[in-house]
Amino acid sequence: LRPEQLGGAAALASRHPDTAIVLCHLGLGHGEPDAEWLGGLTAFAERPNAHAKFSGLLSPTRTDAGLADLADTALRLFRADRLMFGSDWPMSARTHSYADVVAATRRALPHPDTTDFWAGTVTRLYG
């Protein structure tokens, strides 16, 4: 999804409260975060059945600081128990190796309590 579609994702999550809905790429991907994106992501995250993948966010122009800002926003809105790692492989391989994606994500999420982010959330949702 793109930022302008996040309101629709929030509405979908509201209409189907018993269904876990997972948003890829924080609804942003390689785009730049702005007020429209943050408002839509916030509205989506307010639904208890809303989850997000921290994936597809690396680009040749996104800095470690920019990725860390996205991680802080995602953790604030979803907490680690509704947020999960995603490599975006094989698409990410066009610009970054898998090891680079993991390393950049670890730098962006240095928080000690990220077990849910790396494994718990995906295990709960997908078994």
Predicted regions and their residues:
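Tryptophan-centric aromatic hotspots in well-structured domains and transmembrane helices
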Residues: W37-T42, G66-L67, W89, D100-V102, ...
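Divalent metal-coordination and catalytic microenvironments
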Residues: H25, A52, D88, T114, ...
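Mid-to-C-terminal alpha-helical segments outside catalytic/metal-binding sites
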Residues: D72-T73, L77-M84, A93-G127
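Catalytic pocket-lining loop regions of alpha/beta-barrel enzymes
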Residues: L1-M84
